[in-house]
C-alpha cells in the first residue's frame, strides 16, 4: 500500500540501523518521496523497485530542500473523466502523462483526445464515447 510504504519509509529514515521494505509500493508518489528524502540527506536505495533499503541517519544529518511534489494522478483522472462525460476541452497543468499511461490509453480507446505537453496534458472529447473492455489488476 502507498500509505503503509510512506509511513514506514519516513520512520525508517531516522531509525537506528537498516530497514528493508519488501513489496514496497512503486507508485510515482513513493519515488517522489524517496527522492525528496535523499535530497534532504536520507540514505535510501532501491528507489522505484519493490525493495527499498533505508539506512537510518541522525536527525542532524537531515536538512531542508526545495521540492515540487508530484501532481495527484487520481485528481487528474477525475478531470479527464469529467471532460469525457461533458464533451469538454481542458488543459490539466502539471499532469504527467508518463504516470498515467494505462489510463490515458483506455480513455483514448474510448474516444477521448489526450495530448501530452511539456507542462501538462490537453484533454478533449467531442463525440460519443465508445465502450471498451478492460480488467483491473491488484
Tell me the role of every PLM-derived stretch.
Residues 1-138:
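Short, structured segments at the rim of ligand-binding sites
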Amino acid at each position: 500500500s502507498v500509505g503503509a510504504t510512506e509511513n514506514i519509509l519516513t520512520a525508517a529514515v531516522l531509525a537506528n540501523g537498516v530497514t528493508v521494505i519488501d513489496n514496497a509500493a512503486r507508485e510515482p508518489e513513493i519515488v517522489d518521496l524517496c527522492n525528496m528524502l535523499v535530497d534532504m540527506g536520507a540514505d535510501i536505495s532501491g528507489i522505484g523497485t519493490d525493495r527499498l533499503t533505508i539506512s537510518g541517519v541522525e536527525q542532524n544529518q537531515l536538512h531542508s530542500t526545495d521540492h515540487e511534489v508530484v501532481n495527484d494522478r487520481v485528481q487528474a483522472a477525475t478531470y479527464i473523466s469529467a471532460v469525457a462525460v461533458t464533451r469538454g476541452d481542458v488543459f490539466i497543468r502539471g499532469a504527467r502523462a508518463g504516470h498515467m499511461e494505462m489510463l490515458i490509453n483506455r480513455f483514448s480507446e474510448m474516444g477521448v483526445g489526450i495530448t501530452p505537453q511539456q507542462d501538462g496534458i490537453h484533454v478533449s472529447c467531442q463525440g460519443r464515447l465508445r465502450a471498451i473492455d478492460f480488467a483491473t489488476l491488484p
